[in-house]
């Protein structure tokens, strides 16, 4: 078996059955019974509900010693991709999940793979159903891809699938340019969010939780050309998605002047 990745709580390897290859994810089971039941409840719900062309296909799951194993289709890691294709494919996956009541809570480049011509969402270990509380969330979403409400996390605040949408935007930017839009420690990020909120950039970055696109709104305003036999432009329809897309394309109309990402960092 060839190793694909390894972390503190498990690993992913490539296995072969007949002439086909699959990815086998092994997770070390939690020590306490109440945590184990939460894991099992999550797995049962996902297996019943999360079947979609842009969600990685799971073939079987089982217990083995102190590990929980999931066998799924094998995809290729994504290191560079057209941001519009990521918005379209993973946006569809998130819309499907959100319509079923699930929040992924860990959208980032490492959790997207390519299977054939499709991009697919993987790793549902942090997925939960219904709204969640910031008190219980902690560092669920990786820092570079975390929305402001989880960076601040003041008090007990409920959140829904819109946290995934902010993470999706930053993920798409990263995969297009191989660098994060916002890097650094949490206090630096919060300083930038607060500095630009009053100047209008906050809205263009869709940081305001109430004003942010839902996955449904993104797909309603976003049109991607068919991929068969064409590698040309992937056009957006006109509409509010232009504001969303402008954040990803490298410039903003801010106080009647053009300001790029480098300019943002220079002014901090």
Question: Which sequence ranges carry the predicted segments?
Answer:
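Activation segment signature within eukaryotic-like protein kinase domains
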Residues: 86-87
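Conserved end of the kinase activation segment
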Residues: 149-162
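Short beta-strand micro-motifs within the conserved protein kinase catalytic domain, predominantly
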Residues: 57-66
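Catalytic-loop of the protein kinase fold
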Residues: 98-114
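Conserved short submotifs of the Hanks-type protein kinase catalytic core
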Residues: 65-78
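C-terminal lobe of the eukaryotic/viral protein kinase catalytic domain
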Residues: 179-210
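Regulatory extensions flanking the kinase catalytic core
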Residues: 213-253
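Activation segment/activation loop of eukaryotic-type protein kinase catalytic domains
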Residues: 115-143
């Amino acid at each position: 078996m060839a190793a694909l990745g390894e972390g503190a709580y498990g690993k992913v390897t490539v296995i072969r059955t007949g002439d086909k290859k699959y990815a086998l994810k092994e997770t070390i089971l939690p020590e306490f019974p109440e945590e184990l039941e939460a894991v099992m409840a999550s797995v049962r719900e996902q297996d019943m509900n999360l079947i979609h062309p842009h969600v990685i296909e799971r073939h079987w799951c089982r217990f083995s010693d102190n590990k929980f194993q999931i066998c799924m289709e094998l995809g290729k890691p994504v290191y560079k991709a057209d941001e519009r294709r990521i918005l379209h494919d993973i946006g569809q996956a998130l819309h499907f999940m959100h319509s079923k009541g699930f929040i992924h809570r860990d959208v980032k480049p490492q959790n997207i793979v390519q299977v054939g011509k499709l991009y697919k969402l993987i790793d549902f270990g942090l997925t939960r159903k219904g709204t969640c509380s910031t008190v219980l969330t902690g560092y669920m979403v990786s820092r570079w891809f975390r929305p402001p409400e989880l960076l601040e996390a003041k008090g007990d605040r409920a959140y829904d699938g819109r946290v995934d949408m902010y993470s999706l935007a930053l993920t798409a930017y990263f995969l297009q340019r191989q660098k994060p839009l916002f890097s650094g420690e949490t206090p630096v990020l919060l300083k930038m969010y607060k500095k630009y909120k009053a100047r209008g950039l906050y809205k263009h970055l869709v940081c305001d939780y109430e004003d942010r696109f839902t996955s449904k709104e993104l797909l309603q305003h976003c049109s991607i050309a068919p991929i068969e036999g064409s590698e040309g432009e992937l056009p957006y329809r006109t509409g509010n998605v232009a504001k969303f897309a402008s954040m990803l394309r490298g410039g903003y109309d801010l106080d009647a002047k053009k300001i790029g990402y480098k300019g943002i960092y220079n002014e901090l």
